[in-house]
Design a protein with these regions (language model features):
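Bacterial N-terminal signal peptides
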Residues: 10-19
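Conserved beta-strand/short-helix segments
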Residues: 25-553
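Bacterial N-terminal signal peptides that target proteins for export
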Residues: 1-10
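Juxtamembrane cytosolic interface motif at the C-terminal end of transmembrane helices
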Residues: 19-25
């Protein structure tokens, strides 16, 4: 489990307009015609970039700070380290008095061929130093409801719309819900855990529960899932004892529902095999209707290498840190565990579930395995592969599971076409709403290539980052594109966040370490005067475009 303390970045690519008609062969990394075209259509920066704001992502393995609406017409980007003391909507962006209070920037466009414009600058109603508002952003399908987490927010209050001004529990965490009417945004709710944790003394997990470490919205925006990876209860299952604090960083997830404009907590969800430090709730994902819920525990230590359907647990232990994904379903207001998902080659410290994503129908779940050690390439590689290296290599992998009826099974296992040690392939990923496009990032990948399908075997730009775009036809997955930033440089960490529209035709990618001082849309990419300001790159995929050789930037 090497390099977990590294840093991440988000970049959404811009204005390169590179058209490509090649597909990268799943086994060899060679290319074949017929994948359509992918082009970079926007380069997006904060309207107030500052050094270390990390526009698009707060840090390595921390949060999904970029979100797209289902139609791809609204985009939200978090900058968790932004330092303005402004409150709520469109306040003073030039203030820098509250370090790492965090901010979110909302962008909109009229159509998928129209230019992007910033619509709102969004701040917490109670900005606090170090709260990191914007750590996670989530959007409803129409983009009119937005959830934003501040997982280091320090209020001790519980439930909905409580006292925001208390700061007695560092890292307690909070989630804020905003709604849009026309083009106007307003805050609808301030949401806290029903068992906001106790103040600790060690400055890390021993402080608060980190409610809001992960979050997800249903398509209609009426169901919200929130992970608190440092919750300390020893409860198991649904709605157990929330007030116990004997199991450090076991983790939990919370389900909230909205009726009209009022939010209430529906469920408190714990792993069936709760254990200390497994971090259940590290990543969460809801189906479109909100009735299927995937949640990970990326340090879970189960020994299984198969999916276990229909069992309530607990599950056998024996491989520390392999990680697991749990799938729950809802009938009415009642939640039930449906399946326990494990990778077919699970080994100690692989970390399955560092990120999870789910299709709209809930029948496809993708999970990242960033510390997996196998050096094979492609989809379902046939070459022998050692995933139990004496030295942890963190090459990384991803896996897709599918559901037929109520039965889950592993469908595909993904490796980069250019696997490299400590690339962290699978550190971020997202599956499209239709389930047929999968974007997987390797945010520490080292190639100096720029644009689409460039040279993959170059290692001269350390931790520049890359994104790999896969497509599914029937049950078969292939890699379509190898994607790099248009201004790719070392330590930019392109791929620290990824987001896809429902049809997979719009992709946004964050690079938290990008250094340009540009503001707004399509500014100067070549400037490097504001270190780790961050950027986001937007790409457009056209599956029917005629293939042609990639343009050279």
């Amino acid at each position: 489990m090497s390099n977990r303390a590294g840093q991440a970045a988000i970049i959404v690519a811009a204005m390169v307009a590179v058209a490509v008609g090649v597909r990268i062969d799943a086994q060899s990394g060679s290319t074949a015609s017929g994948a359509g075209s992918l082009r970079q259509t926007a380069y997006v920066k904060a309207s107030n970039p500052h050094m270390g704001d990390h526009f698009g992502n707060g840090g390595t393995l921390l949060g999904d700070s970029v979100a797209l609406s289902g139609d791809g017409l609204t985009m939200a980007v978090g900058a968790p380290n932004e330092g303005s003391g402004a409150k709520t909507i469109n306040g003073n962006q030039d203030d820098t008095s509250v370090y790492a209070a965090g901010a979110v920037y909302v962008y909109a466009r009229r159509s998928t061929t129209s230019p992007w414009a910033q619509q709102a600058y969004v701040k917490a109603s109670n900005p606090m130093a170090g709260a990191e508002f914007g750590h996670v952003v989530a959007l409803s399908a129409d983009g009119n409801t937005m959830a934003v987490s501040a997982y280091f927010e320090a209020s001790a209050t519980k439930g909905i719309n409580g006292n925001q001004n208390d700061d007695s529990i560092p890292q307690a965490g909070a989630v804020y819900v905003f709604t849009r009417r026309g083009s106007m945004w307003s805050q609808q709710a301030y949401i806290k855990a029903s068992n906001t944790g106790e103040a600790g003394t060690d400055g890390n997990f021993g402080d608060g529960d980190q409610f809001g470490f992960s979050a997800s919205l249903s398509d209609d925006g009426n169901t919200l899932a929130v992970g608190a990876n440092a919750d300390d209860s020893n409860a198991t299952g649904i709605n157990g004892n929330q007030n116990d604090n004997s199991m450090q960083s076991a983790g939990a997830a919370y389900i909230f529902v909205r009726n009209g404009t009022a939010w209430t907590q529906q469920a408190y969800v714990k792993s069936p095999n709760t254990a200390a430090n497994v971090q259940f709730g590290y990543s969460v994902a809801l189906s479109a209707d909100g009735n299927t819920f995937a949640v990970s525990a990326f340090d879970e230590g189960g020994s299984s290498r198969t999916v276990i359907n229909g069992a309530s647990g607990p599950f056998p232990a024996g491989r520390n840190g392999t990680g697991a994904i749990y799938v729950y379903t809802r009938s009415g207001s009642t939640w039930t565990l449906q399946s326990y998902l494990k990778a077919s080659n699970a080994e100690v410290n692989d970390s399955l579930g560092v990120i999870v994503s789910i299709s709209d129908d809930g029948n496809t779940v993708a999970g990242g395995i960033l510390d997996e050690d196998c050096t094979a390439a492609g989809v379902n590689p046939s070459a022998p592969c050692d995933n139990d290296m004496k030295e942890d290599t963190s090459v990384g992998a991803a896996v897709v599971f599918v559901r037929q009826g109520v039965q889950w099974a592993q469908q595909a296992y993904f490796k980069a076409s250019n696997p490299g040690k400590e690339d962290w392939f699978g550190s971020r990923l997202q599956i499209s709403g239709d389930g047929n496009t999968l974007a997987v990032s390797a945010q520490l990948e080292d190639s100096a290539a720029q644009g689409i399908n460039g040279k993959q075997d170059d290692d001269s730009a350390q931790e520049a980052g890359a994104v790999y775009l896969f497509g599914r036809v029937g049950t078969q997955w292939t890699q379509r594109f190898y994607v790099k930033a248009s201004n790719n440089e070392a330590f930019d960490e392109f791929g620290s966040s990824v987001a896809l529209s429902r049809d997979g035709r719009t992709m946004a990618v964050g690079a938290r370490g990008e250094d340009s001082s540009a503001k707004g849309i399509d500014g100067n990419q070549g400037d490097n005067s504001v270190k780790e300001a961050g950027a986001v790159y937007v790409f457009t995929y056209n599956p029917s475009a005629a293939g042609r050789t990639p343009a050279t930037k």
